[in-house]
Amino acid sequence: MNYFPWLTLIVVFPIAAGSLIFFLPHRGNKVTRGYTIYICVLELLLTTYAFCYNFQLDDPLIQLAEDYKWITFFEFDWRLGIDGLSIGPILLTGFITTLATLAARPVTLNSRLFHFLMLAMYSGQIGSFSSRDLLLFFIMWELELIPVYLLLSVWGGKKRLYSATKFILYTAGGSVFLLIGVLGIGLYGSNEPTLNLETLVNRSYPVALEIIFYIGFFIAFAVKLPIIPFHTWLPDTHGEAHYSTCMLLAGILLKMGAYGLIRINMELLPHAHSIFSPWFMIVGTVQIIYAASTSPGQRNLKKRIAYSSVSHMGFIILGIGSITDTGLNGAVLQIISHGLISAALFFLAGTSYDRIRFAYLDEMGGLAIPIPKIFTLFSILSMASLALPGMSGFVAELIVFFGIITSQKFFLMPKIVITFVMAIGMILTPIYSLSMLRQMFYGYKLFNAPNSYFFDSGPRELFVLISILLPVIGIGIYPDFVLSLSADKAEAIISNFFL
């Protein structure tokens, strides 16, 4: 047993250290930026060290478990622990947040508050991924919503208040269902209420009640993922947010919805999930086609990338709905892969906007010659987004595809239809990705414009982009690096469906 509270340290450290930002000497934004980056790097190193020396890959059970009495009145404990499902998203959170902090260098308005909110969001996200108590999970889930709302409403574009209000209405509405589900599942069927996930995994419910719980949790996570028709907050939010905030939203926030579906809907409510899995397959295929066909119609660059995110989330839904360990591993790999690629694309979109001050694709053109480094990296990462072989997206989508084919849950004909629709989605993806590149970088519009000299990527921007590109290629070449983390846990979750 591990006696050092590694997870408590990892969860509390960012927000505790972040609160000291307000006491730093007034010496400009440079001190604030340097301090925040230092905190993020130190947190990432702490997390990596704790996991390297204390986590056993071949053990599907909870590790680094911590359980402290918190509120004894209704048996509420500070209960943390990780397994193969949560270790990947936690490391992704640390990696993307560190790079997003580096990307936020141009932010000068209220710099202290901005960086504190990023660190508070960091704590909330790691807390959500490592919670082993349902009420603690809900508290952490809500904790990271407040920083996102403020980051949107203060440091966004012209319509920032509209998009921030829309975001908070959608997510707060979803949180109501999450709270009802948490309280219902915790208070059901015993004199002593329990919110301990280990205890709840072994509990059974009447089918009708389990379906009600399942629908409540599903709505909460569908808003965050997002699943259509709960997706309309996402393009508006991404269109108005600062690109460092977009990196956190697309890279981590959306993945919390997928994590919740696996951790609660699949693991706690397997019978209801088995009933709803055909609907997952339908929704996933519709989402891939709908978002991929809607994306080319978006004039705003960041909104087009946002719709591509909605389309790629469809593969995660299909992997979760396949009820196979292969499909579930593919979904987990897609969570990591898309988190990296989408963060890089939003960073590129933001740095391009900083130079040309145009947000709409039909106002751009001819950027390949003045900014060749950005053009090269944008092209490579767009290829990664459309699942080019050798990149992480290709491996993730291929594993999800094999998970559907090998599923015992579905007959041959539905499998063929789903595979055919997935193939159409894969054909539509290059259409919007390549047309985006064509509109931005080819032609003569901006190249021939007066005052058309732009600075190309500097060392900071190249460092951020190459730091993301290397794991994208690394996972594409050797996916076992990620799959070895989740394989045993995925097998343990799927075994519940065939008892």
UniProtKB/Swiss-Prot annotation:
Protein name as annotated: NAD(P)H-quinone oxidoreductase chain 4, chloroplastic
Main location: plastid
Example of a GO MF term: quinone binding
Gene that this sequence comes from: ndhD
Localization in the cell: Plastid, Chloroplast thylakoid membrane
Transmembrane segments: 4-24, 35-55, 84-104, 111-129, 134-154, 167-187, 208-228, 242-262, 272-292, 305-325, 330-350, 386-406, 416-436, 462-482
Topological type in the membrane: Multi-pass membrane protein
EC number: 7.1.1.-
Top EC class for this record: translocase
Any one GO cellular component localisation term in the record: chloroplast thylakoid membrane
One GO BP annotation of this record: ATP synthesis coupled electron transport
Catalytic activity: a plastoquinone + NADH + (n+1) H(+)(in) = a plastoquinol + NAD(+) + n H(+)(out); a plastoquinone + NADPH + (n+1) H(+)(in) = a plastoquinol + NADP(+) + n H(+)(out)
Family that this chain belongs to: Belongs to the complex I subunit 4 family.
Domain of life: Eukaryota
Keywords: Chloroplast, Membrane, NAD, NADP, Plastid, Plastoquinone, Quinone, Thylakoid, Translocase, Transmembrane, Transmembrane helix
